[in-house]
Amino acid sequence: MDGNPFEETMTLRSDVGALLAEMPIFSGLDATLLREIASAVEWLSLPGGAKLFSAGDPSDALYMVLSGCLGAFSDDPTRRRFLARIAAGDMVGEMGLISGRPRSADVVALRDTELARISAKAFNEVLRGQPEAMLRIARLTVDRLAQSQSPAAAARSRGACTFTVLPQSVEVDFGGFASRLVKALSELGRAELVWSVRAKTHTSQWFNRIESSNDYVVYVADPTPDRWTKLCVRQADALLLLARAESPAGNWAALRWPHDHSMAPQRSELVLLHDSTLETGAAARWLADLPELPHHHVQSPGDYSRLARVLTGRGVGLVLSGGGARGFAHIGVVKALREAGVPVDLVGGTSMGAILGAGVALRWSTDELQERIRRAFVDSRPLRDYTLPFVSLVSGRKVSTSLYEAFGDLAIEDLPIDFFCVSSNLTTGQSMVHRRGTLWRWLRSSVSVPGVLPPVLHNGEVLVDGAAMNNLPVDVMRELGRGPVIGCDVGGADRAFTARTDEIDVPLPWQLLRWMKARRQRPSIFQILWRAGMVNSNASTIAHRAQSDLILQPPLAEVDMLNWDAFDRAIQAGYEYAIRKLEELPADSPILRSAVADA
């Protein structure tokens, strides 16, 4: 055994004064006051899976994590969400203690955890008569709260630091995968790989030392449910369920083995290893019994770097808005990001932004993206298959054909880069996010401008253009908690949408010819329907811009949303604008910190 666990625990406890001095809210207090606070400390050992407190409980104490790890979870019984990781050296509960408000989240031990507890009564008694110290603590707490609420900080707090690779069978190359993942994590910080042969004889304090001396630790579990596997599960912030994509879908024996790490399933993620080519249909097969599980495709060396960023809350998400022909500017933005070495680890979009985002998720080169989109929307003129306007002005067949020719029978879950698109459900009155299913079909729903294209009818519900309710779905990307988010909004003010005459009614039949000759004085029915389908989401778009770590709004006000011939001009405008904005970013921007040389 590596040391005496009782002695090591006592060493941690004897250093509580030094630990207090390192805590931001106590730093700067004089030594006498720190000793008084230290004397009021109580000790608490919490086994993995045990709850420290629940949302709504009275805020009767603050806690310092000496070893182990806690997780904060939302208290929504219908949709439990992981909010933050509280690691050794962190503090929890001080906000409620100072504000007097009840606990705002459930806090659970993600593994065996040692805590130092200071009751509200002891805290107040020590600081009574110390107004300057109390004011300092209050100010630091407010500052800490403000910092923690920044989008980038929130994503990092939800990112994992310790991972357990759980192979589905002995046929999986779990050793090679773990080694390559550690190499990728080493690009982000100090990382270490822990095998059973190295760690089986060590105490929990040995594991704590390994984790405290590294930014990231990867444990390699056995495919069988043995003691080592149980220990790995208890140590993990995230379980990586590893499988060969081409293998028949199966279960993980270790997950059927009873253990007391009740929160583990909240942090499980499926990783599918591919050979030389991506196995289409594999994700749906594996996700049939795990429909809500996040999943990742790993094939090339770059996929390990992407996986490392996404797992640790450093993945870059790109969100592309709708905007008709203005959406071509997204191609220029993608080109600029690639030239700057900024990776796109996740992508989502609405309407035209969804189509371009799907191309990015397929890892099309910039030239291929440009050529395919030109062929689909400029050369083929898909909005010229007019029909009797019972449901829409256009039949939609040419749009459907163009989308099918571009994407075939691909499913969203098979895309190498995580992708989603958004449509508007007129039946429920809510925005719909599509993460699974046939790609071209959901893209077709996302671009179905009401009145211009027929809606997509699905399970008795009517789906139309996502821009009607959420034209810039940064909120959807932010909810994933994977890292910084870049939003590109091309659906803003439209100077081309103007009228140069004053009138109320359409002219009488014998005046129509002269009226049509002057059509440039008034918007067309296409323009009216297109614009009307977007303005409803203006308020949400403004809010979602603010949620972006970087918001890009290329100058496209002079580009008509239906001017497909503005293809090259829009691309160039997006490219030049994005280059300027990226050059203006501060060196410590979370987006630039994620930049890679081989993006």
Identify the meaning behind each predicted range.
Residues 265-268, 273-292, 302-303, 316, ...:
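Non-catalytic peripheral regions of patatin-like phospholipases
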Residues 37, 209-210, 220, 232, ...:
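Structural alpha-helical scaffold elements that stabilize or flank donor/cofactor-binding regions
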Residues 211-227, 464-467:
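Switch II (G3) loop of P-loop NTPases
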Residues 302-347:
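Helix-rich "cap/lid" substructures immediately adjacent to catalytic or cofactor-binding pockets
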Residues 219-299:
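Conserved catalytic-core segment of NTP-binding enzymes
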Residues 1-167, 173-175:
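Cytosolic regulatory regions built on CNB/CRP/Popeye-like sensor folds
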Residues 153-188, 192-197, 315-322:
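Walker A (P-loop) phosphate-binding motif
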Residues 321, 343-362:
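Catalytic nucleophile loop
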